[in-house]
Curated annotation (Swiss-Prot):
Keywords: Acute phase, Antimicrobial, Cytoplasm, Disulfide bond, Inflammatory response, Lectin, Metal-binding, Secreted, Signal, Zinc. One of its GO terms (molecular function) is metal ion binding. A motif (EPN) lies at residues 114-116. InterPro entries: C-type_lectin-like, C-type_lectin-like/link_sf, C-type_lectin/snaclec_domain, C-type_lectin_CS, CTDL_fold. The keyword Transport does not apply. Zn(2+) binds at H107, E121, H145. Disulfide bonds join C40-C51, C68-C171, C146-C163. Pfam families: Lectin_C (PF00059). One of its GO terms (cellular component) is extracellular space. It is found in: Secreted; Cytoplasm. This is Regenerating islet-derived protein 3-gamma. The EPN motif is essential for recognition of the peptidoglycan carbohydrate backbone and for efficient bacterial killing with Glu-114 playing a key role in peptidoglycan binding and bactericidal activity. Bactericidal C-type lectin which acts exclusively against Gram-positive bacteria and mediates bacterial killing by binding to surface-exposed carbohydrate moieties of peptidoglycan. Restricts bacterial colonization of the intestinal epithelial surface and consequently limits activation of adaptive immune responses by the microbiota. Acts as a hormone in response to different stimuli like anti-inflammatory signals, such as IL17A, or gut microbiome. Is secreted by different cell types to activate its receptor EXTL3 and induce cell specific signaling pathways. Induced by IL17A in keratinocytes, regulates keratinocyte proliferation and differentiation after skin injury. In parallel, inhibits skin inflammation through the inhibition of inflammatory cytokines such as IL6 and TNF. Induced by IL22 in lung epithelial cells, inhibits cytokine production and regulates allergic airway inflammation.
C-alpha cells in the first residue's frame, strides 16, 4: 500500500495521463473526419461541399460559363442527382421567380450531330449519369444546344435553349 503522502502525486499523474490520452485520441479522430467547407463565396449557399450562386445579370451561355470560371473553382452548375436538382431549384425560386429560364452547365458541343442526343455534356466535365430532361432534345425539331432550367417545371427539369439567348445563370464552386 502507498503511503498517504504519495496518493496526491499518483492522482495527479493519473489525471495528467488521462488528459494526454484524451487529447491524443481527439487528434486522431479529427484527422479521420473530412474537413467541411469553412465558408462559401459571398452571396452563395452551400449544399454538401460545393457552394452555389445565382447570378441575375443575363448572359449568353458561353459568357455565363466564362463568368463562373473567373471565380475560384467556379463552373456553370452541373446537376448530378435529384437531390442536388431540388437544392438548385429552391435556390433559384428563393431569389427570383421573374425569369422563365436559367442557364446550367449542360451543352451539346456536337450541335446535335450525335445520334439520340448523346452529345450532351457538363462544361465542368462531370460525368453525366443523371438526367432530368423536360423533353428529350433529340426529339425537338429546332433544338438549342445549351441547357437551361425552366420555370414551367419549377426549375427542376432541363430544356435545351438557344446558346446566344441572354439568361441568368447558376455557378457551382467546388473546394
Amino acid at each position: 500500500m502507498l503511503p498517504p503522502m504519495a496518493l496526491p502525486s499518483v492522482s495527479w499523474m493519473l489525471l495528467s495521463c488521462l488528459i494526454l490520452l484524451c487529447q491524443v485520441q481527439g487528434e486522431e479522430t479529427q484527422k479521420e473526419l473530412p474537413s467541411p467547407r469553412i465558408s462559401c463565396p459571398k452571396g452563395s449557399k452551400a449544399y454538401g461541399s460545393p457552394c452555389y450562386a445565382l447570378f441575375l445579370s443575363p448572359k449568353s451561355w458561353m459568357d455565363a460559363d466564362l463568368a463562373c470560371q473567373k471565380r475560384p473553382s467556379g463552373k456553370l452548375v452541373s446537376v448530378l442527382s435529384g437531390a442536388e436538382g431540388s437544392f438548385v431549384s429552391s435556390l433559384v425560386r428563393s431569389i427570383s421567380n421573374s425569369y422563365s429560364y436559367i442557364w446550367i452547365g449542360l451543352h451539346d458541343p456536337t450541335q446535335g450531330s450525335e445520334p439520340d442526343g448523346d452529345g450532351w455534356e457538363w462544361s465542368s466535365t462531370d460525368v453525366m449519369n443523371y438526367f432530368a430532361w423536360e423533353k428529350n432534345p433529340s426529339t425537338i425539331l429546332n433544338p438549342g444546344h445549351c441547357g437551361s432550367l425552366s420555370r414551367s417545371t419549377g426549375f427542376l427539369k432541363w430544356k435545351d435553349y438557344n446558346c446566344d439567348a441572354k439568361l441568368p445563370y447558376v455557378c457551382k464552386f467546388k473546394d
